[in-house]
Amino acid sequence: SRIGPGLVVLLGVSRADGSGQARKVADRIHKLRIFGDDEGRMNEALGDREVLCVSQFTLYADTTSGNRPGYREAEPGETAEPLYEEVCELLGARRGVFGADMEVEITGDGPVTITLEV
Protein backbone atom coordinates (compact mmCIF):
# COMPACT_ATOMS: atom_id res chain seq x y z
CA SER A 1 0.00 0.00 0.00
CA ARG A 2 1.03 3.58 -0.57
CA ILE A 3 -0.27 6.83 0.86
CA GLY A 4 0.24 10.52 0.25
CA PRO A 5 0.71 13.05 3.05
CA GLY A 6 -0.51 11.62 6.33
CA LEU A 7 0.48 9.17 9.03
CA VAL A 8 2.19 5.83 9.23
CA VAL A 9 0.84 4.11 12.34
CA LEU A 10 3.00 1.29 13.68
CA LEU A 11 0.39 -0.45 15.77
CA GLY A 12 1.29 -2.85 18.56
CA VAL A 13 -1.31 -4.66 20.64
CA SER A 14 -0.41 -5.62 24.21
CA ARG A 15 -1.91 -8.28 26.44
CA ALA A 16 -3.42 -5.47 28.52
CA ASP A 17 -5.42 -4.08 25.58
CA GLY A 18 -9.11 -4.87 25.42
CA SER A 19 -11.81 -4.58 22.80
CA GLY A 20 -12.64 -1.00 23.84
CA GLN A 21 -9.11 0.15 23.02
CA ALA A 22 -9.64 0.33 19.26
CA ARG A 23 -12.04 3.27 19.41
CA LYS A 24 -9.86 5.08 21.98
CA VAL A 25 -6.76 4.68 19.83
CA ALA A 26 -8.50 5.76 16.63
CA ASP A 27 -10.13 8.78 18.31
CA ARG A 28 -6.81 9.84 19.81
CA ILE A 29 -5.04 9.55 16.46
CA HIS A 30 -7.77 11.57 14.72
CA LYS A 31 -7.58 14.36 17.32
CA LEU A 32 -3.81 14.68 17.78
CA ARG A 33 -2.65 18.07 16.54
CA ILE A 34 0.64 16.96 15.04
CA PHE A 35 0.59 18.48 11.56
CA GLY A 36 2.03 21.88 10.77
CA ASP A 37 -0.24 24.86 10.27
CA ASP A 38 0.51 27.84 7.98
CA GLU A 39 3.10 29.04 10.49
CA GLY A 40 4.79 25.64 10.75
CA ARG A 41 3.52 24.91 14.27
CA MET A 42 2.05 21.52 15.13
CA ASN A 43 -1.51 22.70 15.31
CA GLU A 44 -3.57 20.64 12.85
CA ALA A 45 -5.22 17.26 13.30
CA LEU A 46 -5.34 14.41 10.77
CA GLY A 47 -8.32 15.77 8.85
CA ASP A 48 -8.41 14.43 5.28
CA ARG A 49 -4.84 13.14 5.32
CA GLU A 50 -4.19 9.47 4.69
CA VAL A 51 -3.20 6.74 7.15
CA LEU A 52 -1.16 3.58 6.66
CA CYS A 53 -1.31 1.02 9.49
CA VAL A 54 1.42 -1.57 9.96
CA SER A 55 1.15 -4.25 12.65
CA GLN A 56 4.18 -4.07 14.92
CA PHE A 57 4.32 -6.51 17.84
CA THR A 58 7.99 -5.59 18.38
CA LEU A 59 6.86 -2.34 20.02
CA TYR A 60 6.33 -4.50 23.11
CA ALA A 61 9.85 -5.92 23.14
CA ASP A 62 11.27 -6.48 26.62
CA THR A 63 14.99 -5.73 26.55
CA THR A 64 15.58 -5.57 30.31
CA SER A 65 17.69 -8.71 30.42
CA GLY A 66 19.71 -10.85 28.07
CA ASN A 67 20.61 -10.12 24.48
CA ARG A 68 17.43 -11.30 22.82
CA PRO A 69 14.19 -9.32 23.24
CA GLY A 70 11.21 -11.06 24.78
CA TYR A 71 7.66 -10.41 23.61
CA ARG A 72 5.49 -11.72 26.44
CA GLU A 73 3.69 -8.35 26.72
CA ALA A 74 2.62 -8.51 23.06
CA GLU A 75 -0.82 -9.98 22.41
CA PRO A 76 -0.70 -13.21 20.35
CA GLY A 77 -1.54 -12.71 16.68
CA GLU A 78 -4.87 -14.53 16.68
CA THR A 79 -6.29 -12.16 19.30
CA ALA A 80 -4.33 -9.05 18.26
CA GLU A 81 -5.46 -9.10 14.63
CA PRO A 82 -9.15 -8.25 15.25
CA LEU A 83 -8.16 -5.19 17.31
CA TYR A 84 -5.65 -4.15 14.64
CA GLU A 85 -8.29 -4.52 11.92
CA GLU A 86 -10.82 -2.52 13.95
CA VAL A 87 -8.38 0.37 14.44
CA CYS A 88 -7.60 0.33 10.71
CA GLU A 89 -11.31 0.41 9.83
CA LEU A 90 -12.02 3.27 12.24
CA LEU A 91 -9.15 5.28 10.76
CA GLY A 92 -10.10 4.47 7.17
CA ALA A 93 -6.50 3.32 6.84
CA ARG A 94 -4.68 1.44 4.18
CA ARG A 95 -2.81 -1.40 5.77
CA GLY A 96 -0.02 -3.86 5.53
CA VAL A 97 -0.62 -7.59 5.85
CA PHE A 98 -1.05 -8.44 9.52
CA GLY A 99 1.86 -10.48 10.89
CA ALA A 100 3.76 -10.55 7.60
CA ASP A 101 7.39 -9.66 7.05
CA MET A 102 7.26 -6.52 4.94
CA GLU A 103 9.58 -3.95 3.50
CA VAL A 104 8.29 -0.59 4.69
CA GLU A 105 9.67 2.64 3.28
CA ILE A 106 8.76 5.76 5.23
CA THR A 107 9.62 9.29 4.17
CA GLY A 108 9.18 11.42 7.27
CA ASP A 109 8.47 15.13 7.40
CA GLY A 110 10.27 16.35 10.45
CA PRO A 111 10.74 13.54 11.28
CA VAL A 112 8.22 13.24 14.07
CA THR A 113 7.73 10.00 15.99
CA ILE A 114 5.15 9.87 18.76
CA THR A 115 4.42 6.95 21.08
CA LEU A 116 0.74 6.84 21.93
CA GLU A 117 -0.54 4.72 24.83
CA VAL A 118 -4.24 4.72 25.68
Which positions does each model-derived feature cover?
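Short hinge/gating elements
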Residues: 66-74
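N-terminal, polar/charged subdomain of small-to-medium soluble alpha/beta proteins
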Residues: 1-66, 78, 82-118
